[in-house]
């Protein structure tokens, strides 16, 4: 059938073999981390120069079969012009370790791509056609391989961390027509990128379909099945327990089985894998061609511009130009991959937050459904309480209006009371004046009574005197009659004298009678005047007593009404009858007029 190993590069098969063991160890997380392996595309390249002093593989021969002895060197044994290849912590993803906080610095690169001396456009590494025999970045020469890797800057030698676990191996060139040229499994080698998955990275980033990813997964599963026989022939101890193998220790592989059926079956499976890989590569080239045209047009335009503007740039070596472009593109790819990882981490955190928020939302909805009837009841109670509060507010406003009206009425009543008190004081002054006038009249009346009594006494005396005079007159008349009878007998002189005395006595009697009559008339006038004054005094006394009774009645009514108003104000101030309207009896209880006792004059 020919040498199958001649169709596949040693590093590719070795990486497949390592990936087969790695796939068995993390079969459950393979699909989850498939895209992470695709991020590692175009990061690394294998050095195919096995003749240098850095080769760590030794070859031995036993029973016409070649086996590979692989060992691991320490960190310091690596060349300084190569970056360390390590198995990443993110699901087995390998790549150059950059500090995520401080991304690597881009080399100064102009906006116009430099052209090589043979007028060919420098194509970006991410879009170069990938040969079907290699799963990593393909190079035409060891020099381009050296330019593919990131050289360590001389001023910052410790910026990138060197990680152990470089997988190195060598294949013998003899025995091309046998399966002994296949590399065996090395337990000390680190996990490499799967060559069947590497084309998925650029296509997924630059518009590739998901068919290539699924096809790569199917091919990788077939690779696992084909390499299980090799792992079982070795006893399966190394693949089943990779953690028990010590780092840095060398491992000697036992020769392969001589079963021809197994060899033919493996060769057929390898051929099938190779054809599937070629199909996948062709589909990837077709997908890459469309996206690479835009990047191919740019160097053409820049070539024309550089021919016009920078004629000296043609003298620069093509290796420097390719190195600069590759470094810039690789740094850009690394930055994009770091951004992608950050975005994935952010997406995972956001998904976790979304789950937490959904759980909280469900709990809140359950609480809402639980609290809905209680909330309706509380809302109904709040509505009732608000209605009661509005009603109480209205009643409070009405009571405040009533209180204000009562207060204004109380103020007006106080003003009226003040006026009535002033009037009462004026009336009291008048009554005092009238009482003083009445006293003076009483004194005058007493004087008049005394005078009347004196006049009565004088009239009695005059009556007695008149009676005496009448008796004397009668006696004189009797004597005169006796003298008349005795006149003719006696001398005439005695009769004349007696006759002359009679008219004088008569005149005296008339005068006394006239005086008595005058005295009687004066007495009658005085008694009538006294009676008239007594009647006037009685009438005035009755008027004064009645007026005083009215004043006392109004004063008592006003006093009682003021007492009731003061009690009502005190109750309002204490708030005893805040919500109940009350009526104040402003008229008050009328005191009977007969119960009022006036001041005795």
Swiss-Prot record:
Instruction: Give the InterPro entries listed for this entry.
Output: LZTS (IPR045329)
Q: Where is the lipid attached (N-myristoyl glycine)?
A: 2
Ranges of Polar residues compositional bias?
Answer: 174-190
- From the UniProt entry, list the residue stretches annotated as the region Disordered: 135-190
Tissue distribution: Highly expressed in brain, in particular in cortex, the CA2 region of the hippocampus, olfactory bulb, striatum and pons. Not detectable in the other tissues tested.
> Can you summarize the PTM annotation of this record?
Phosphorylated on serine residues. Hyperphosphorylated by the cAMP-dependent kinase PKA during cell-cycle progression.
Task: Please give a single GO biological process term from the UniProt record.
Answer: regulation of synaptic plasticity
Q: Which residues form a coiled coil?
A: 255-573
Gene Ontology cellular component annotations, sorted alphabetically? apical plasma membrane; cell body; cytoplasm; dendritic shaft; dendritic spine; glutamatergic synapse; postsynaptic density membrane; postsynaptic membrane
Q: Please indicate which superkingdom the organism of origin belongs to.
A: Eukaryota
Family statement = Belongs to the LZTS family.
Function of the protein:
Involved in the regulation of cell growth. May stabilize the active CDC2-cyclin B1 complex and thereby contribute to the regulation of the cell cycle and the prevention of uncontrolled cell proliferation. May act as tumor suppressor.
Q: How does it assemble?
A: Binds EEF1G, TLK2 and CDK1.
Protein name, per record: Leucine zipper putative tumor suppressor 1
Organism whose genome encodes this protein: Rattus norvegicus
Per the UniProt record, the lineage of the source organism begins with:
Eukaryota, Metazoa, Chordata, Craniata, Vertebrata
């Amino acid at each position: 059938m020919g040498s199958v190993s001649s169709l596949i590069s040693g590093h590719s098969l070795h990486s497949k073999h390592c990936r087969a063991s790695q796939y068995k160890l993390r079969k459950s997380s393979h699909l989850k981390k498939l895209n992470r392996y695709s991020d590692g595309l175009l990061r690394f390249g294998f050095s195919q120069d096995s003749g240098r002093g850095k080769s760590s593989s030794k070859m031995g021969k036993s029973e016409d079969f070649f086996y590979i002895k692989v060992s691991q060197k320490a960190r310091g044994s690596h060349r300084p012009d190569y970056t360390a290849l390590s198995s990443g912590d993110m699901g087995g993803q390998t790549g150059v370790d950059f500090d995520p906080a401080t991304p690597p610095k881009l080399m100064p690169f102009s906006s116009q791509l430099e052209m090589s001396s043979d007028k060919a456009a420098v194509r970006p590494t991410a879009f170069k056609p990938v040969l079907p025999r290699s799963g990593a970045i393909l190079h035409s020469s060891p020099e381009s391989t050296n330019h593919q890797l990131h050289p360590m800057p001389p001023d910052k030698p410790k910026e990138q961390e060197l990680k152990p676990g470089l997988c190195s191996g060598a294949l013998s060139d003899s025995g091309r027509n046998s399966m002994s040229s296949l590399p065996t499994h090395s337990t000390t080698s680190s996990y490499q990128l799967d060559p069947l998955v590497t084309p998925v990275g650029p296509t997924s980033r630059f518009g590739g379909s998901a068919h290539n990813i699924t096809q790569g997964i199917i091919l990788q599963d077939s690779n696992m099945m084909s390499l299980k026989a090799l792992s079982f022939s070795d006893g399966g101890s190394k693949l089943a327990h990779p953690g028990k193998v010590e780092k840095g220790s060398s491992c000697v592989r036992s020769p392969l089985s001589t079963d021809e059926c197994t060899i033919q079956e493996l060769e057929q499976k390898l051929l099938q894998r190779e054809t599937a890989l070629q199909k996948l590569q062709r589909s990837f080239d077709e997908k890459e061609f469309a996206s690479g045209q835009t990047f191919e047009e740019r160097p053409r335009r820049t070539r024309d511009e550089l021919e016009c503007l920078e004629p000296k740039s043609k003298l620069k070596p093509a290796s420097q130009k390719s190195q600069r472009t590759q470094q810039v593109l690789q740094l850009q790819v690394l930055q994009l991959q770091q951004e992608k990882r950050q975005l994935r981490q952010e997406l995972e955190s956001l998904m976790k937050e979304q789950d937490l928020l959904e759980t909280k939302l469900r709990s809140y909805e359950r609480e809402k459904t639980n609290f809905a009837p209680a909330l309706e009841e509380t809302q109904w109670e709040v509505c009732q309480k608000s209605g009661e509060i509005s009603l109480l507010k209205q009643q409070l406003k009405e009571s405040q209006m009533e209180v204000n009206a009562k207060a204004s009425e109380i103020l007006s009543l106080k003003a009226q009371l003040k006026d009535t008190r002033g009037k009462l004081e004026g009336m009291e002054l008048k009554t005092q004046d009238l009482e003083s006038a009445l006293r003076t009249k009483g004194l005058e009346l007493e004087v008049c009574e005394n005078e009347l009594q004196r006049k009565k006494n004088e009239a009695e005396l005059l009556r007695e005197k008149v009676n005496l005079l009448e008796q004397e007159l009668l006696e004189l008349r009797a004597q005169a009659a006796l003298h008349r009878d005795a006149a003719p007998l006696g001398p005439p002189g005695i009769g004349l004298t007696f006759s002359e005395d009679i008219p004088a006595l008569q005149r005296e009697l008339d005068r006394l009678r006239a005086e008595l009559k005058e005295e009687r008339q004066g007495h009658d006038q005085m008694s009538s005047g006294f009676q008239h004054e007594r009647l006037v005094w009685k009438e005035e006394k009755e008027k004064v007593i009645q007026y005083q009774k009215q004043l006392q009645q109004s004063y008592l009514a006003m006093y009682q009404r003021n007492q009731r108003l003061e009690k009502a104000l005190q109750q309002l101030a204490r708030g005893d009858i805040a919500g109940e309207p009350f009526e104040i009896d402003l008229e008050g209880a009328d005191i009977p007029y007969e119960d009022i006792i006036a001041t005795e004059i």
